[in-house]
């Protein structure tokens, strides 16, 4: 799968100076499956907007976004539903967890739809992220960094061609963010998938084949 932006920019960004951007309104920006991309920018530069456009939940943009040469605007609701189940996994900046459910229940809710990971595989990921003792606590009482780790585990419980990650390490310490990122890269490699990750600042501890300034 290939995602291509052609002179694309979200409409609200037209009011800003985007002259230094390596993404907005460029002739062609290509994201290829199997490759890793880190998009760096301060707040308000449209990082969430970019991922929301690619995921199909934001349509207020100028230019074109194509997936394997098919404009996203041509996709039906049914096609988008299938893509979000099989081709795109998303770690939302706001996480979108259910506070009244436990960490485990939030994860299993996704895995019950996809049946992609075994209970043992989920437990192993949780151990690697230092979350094994928090899996049966309500998501609403976990720290934001712990919630981010729950969202990461959940995102890995489905097949995907691209993983979209919106500032998913912002409240995780450097050691655990490095562990989490390596888990993500390992899963992407196993699935032959790409990752598009947004970040507020340059993360020297996170490696990527491509870095772009938004």
What are the language-model segments listed below?
Residues 152:
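Hydrophobic anchor residue at the start of the ABC signature
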Residues 72-89:
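ABC ATPase NBD coupling module
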Residues 55:
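Helix-to-loop junction immediately C-terminal to a conserved catalytic motif
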Residues 138-142, 146:
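Conserved ABC ATPase signature
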Residues 163-167:
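Catalytic Walker B motif of ABC-type/P-loop ATPase nucleotide-binding domains
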Residues 63-72:
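Conserved ABC transporter NBD signature motif
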Residues 119-134:
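Conserved ABC ATPase "signature" region
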